[in-house]
Every structure is written in C-alpha cells, then in structure tokens.
C-alpha cells in the first residue's frame, strides 16, 4: 500500500549499494531510478534519469522517427513524380504519327530524327536513374501513432439520476471483525472514483458489496454493472479474439479494433483464439470487454496489477474516455492521479471523502 511503498523508497534511497529493480510503478521509478534499462525486442537500451526523464527521451525519439519517416515519404514522392514525368517525356518524344511514318525521311530531316532518338534515350536513361534512386532509398519504418479512444454517445449511459448508487448505513463483518461500519456515500453519475486505503481496509469488500447488491445499497433502475476482480482473466473460449469481442458489444468494429490496437494487438493477432492467449493478453481482453459491453457502471479491483506500463496507460485512456461511472481500487499513485475525478478513503471501516 501507499504507506509501505513510501517506507521502502526511504530505505532504498539511503542504501549505499547498487539497487537493480523491476517495476511498473511510475511513482516508485521516479523516486528511485537514476538509470532506466529498457528491454525491447531482445535488446537493452540505457536511458539516464528517472521515469519522467525516460518519457521525455522516448517522446524525442518518437518525434525524430516521425520526422525521418515524413522526410522519406516526401523524398520518395518527389522522385516518383520526377520518374513519371521523365517517362512521359520519353514516350512523347518517341511518338510518331502514322502520317509521319508513311513519309519518306529526307536527308535533311535525318539529323533531326537522330537528334530525337538521342533525346528519347537520354530521357529514358534519366528515368532509369531516378528509379534506381528510389530503389536505393533506405527502408524507413512508419512511426507508430497513437489513436485517440472515443466512445460514442449511447443510451445505456442515460440513467436519469445524478446519483445512480446510494449507500446508506452499510455494515459488513467477517469472522467477528467489522470491515465496513455504517458506511454512507452517494456515487455521482459519470464520476471516476478512486477507492483508497491501507491493505485490509476493506476496499475490495466494499466493491464486492456493490456487486452483490447489498440491501443497504440502492441502485437506479437502469444501472448495469460490469466488474473486474484481481486475477479475473481466465477466459475459456475458442473464438478468435476479434469475433469474441464483437459478439459482446453494440459498438462498431472500428472502435473494437482501435481498443485492441491500443492494447498492443496488431492485425495479425486478431484471429488468435481466446484460449491461446497468455495471462497478460487475457487480462487485456477482459478489461477491453468491460468497456465495450452495455455496462454503465464499472467496478475495477486493482486493475493495474500484472499490467505493463503501456497497458496501464491504455487503461487510463479507456477510463477517461468512458462515459459511464467507474469505481476502482489501486495502490498505483500515478494511475489514481491520472484518472480519478474523486477520491474516497476507507479507514477503520469508515468513508473519508476527499
């Protein structure tokens, strides 16, 4: 939890030896890292500084790749246009009408005819040289561009109630221990609510009571819940992943593809069977499914666990773009800062709203 992470950061900050660590926690990386080793495509690349410095360097690299690719496309287009023009000129110089062919070439015109042949050959030679330059252009990979996620307006989000969930005097005990004690809170429409607190404070229990429709919790009639639990990613299905998701949504294939692309799935991955996915890939599909199903309130219990940084950032975009209400637990401070519009703390079984 937050308190123990800060203690760990303090301990490691004053440690005099070398620390080599693996983490997807951006707060932790920013506090401790002096160098970052990025492992990608079988290679390791070193960046100096903490995570924020790493991000700035990555953005610069991305912009450089974009500029190089843009210049490559510009040069290639210019050469192709020049090649087409020279080809047309060569063809025009070689064109002789039927009437001209039937005419007997006089000695006085012979020199002019030879000159035309010379011009034609020169133009063809120039065109060939331009084509060779095109072939010699180095292959430049297209810079990856992020696609902004936009969820269209949908009637499923019209709940006609500014507080679709009201909790009144919710009490819950387990094994003679009171976990939630007369909790009272209203969940506003379309808010992104972070549920924070120490380990064991009752955050997951709180979400479970909402999911179970505890008698002390009142729902607007049109509420439809979607839930994600820790380790909730075991999908048993032999359908291709694109087909699997399209069967579970009213959104267009374009939107589903854009979500999959943002989660790192390329065109060649879309026919992969659900049952063949790795654990990390299955988590991505489970989360994507939540945001495209006809839900209007989503409960997420520690969704960033087991996710790499790129997927965490994609999830941040999904939550921010989502038009419904999201209630989530997370110990990832950066994640909370990025997406939460409201933060609720659980302490000693009580709600502290901040």
Indicate where each model-derived feature is located.
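ABC ATP-binding cassette signature C-motif
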Residues: 1-70, 157-354
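Coupling and communication elements adjacent to P-loop NTPase active sites across diverse families
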Residues: 60-175
